[in-house]
Amino acid sequence: MEALKQYIRQMIDISEQDLSQLLSTATTRQYKRLQLLSSPGTVPNEIFFVIEGIVRVVITDNEGEEHTVHFAIENQFIADYSGYILMQPAMYSLQAVQHTAAIVLPRAAIDWGYAHLPHGQKLGRLVAEYYFIYQDHRIKNIYARTPAERYNSITDVFPNIHNRVPQHMIASY
């Protein structure tokens, strides 16, 4: 939990009491290799903060082929954000690529933070801005780079990923 506390403190000014209240319903969960953190078809009600391991965001096309949309490594948030925000069934699977530990923030904690923290809205905005910029870069990479260039540049965003993730997952990215 300390890694998440440190992350939040770097983003906003927050009292120890408010931080404790925000994280009072958060839990740390362990996920085995290839275990799902969340599945398509269910409304996401949690946001995950990776403290150890790697999570892969996967979408499966109509032919059953998996496509890696995103990875999350240590000290990053991950969720099916569209499903979470719109309160609609998820389109993505979140899968632990290796043994993964994540802090799970339930919707109630996030909602409490927005409503009660002096800088709760700012925290949410900063996380959303990070994810928006990541997705924008991802779209540019898909359309402006060759597959080889994308493969070679993935370490800019995810250091050491070639040693941590099977090649077929990187190739589908």
Over which residues does each language-model region extend?
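Cyclic nucleotide-binding regulatory module and flanking cytosolic helices
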Residues: 1-27
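Cyclic-nucleotide recognition modules
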Residues: 68-126
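Glycine- and acidic-residue-biased ligand/ion/polar-headgroup-sensing regions
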Residues: 34, 45, 49-56, 74-75
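Alpha-helical bundle regulatory/interaction domains
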Residues: 1, 109-110, 124, 131-133
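Short phosphate-coordinating micro-motif centered on Lys-Gly-acidic
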Residues: 37-42
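Short beta-strand segments in beta-sandwich/barrel cores
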Residues: 27, 54-59, 77, 101-102
